[in-house]
């Protein structure tokens, strides 16, 4: 069993902000996120940022006055790749911001409450109990 001052489930805006703040106060903090693809939360990965990126790039394509389907298809593929690059970079930066803090540990796995003070985390490699 690993003991922490705080266990935060979810690596979204609230979780990462709280973890960084508590970590800077020298609290030992565990952050649990179900998937590496969701570090940073919904906004960064599947919400605000990717949506705004695709909307912007669709407007760029619209004003490019393409004349063939192939030109639009190429713009679409480039937009999807640009969205992927942006979300990957933001996800990595969010992970590094927490992982670089000595008192914060990030777990990638599924969290379940065992009791009011214990959380079980099932990762790809092991099952850990946090308290």
Give the residues covered by each predicted segment.
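Glycine-rich flavin
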Residues: 2-4, 25-27, 33-131
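N-terminal Rossmann-like FAD-binding beta1-loop-alpha1 element of flavoenzymes
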Residues: 4-31
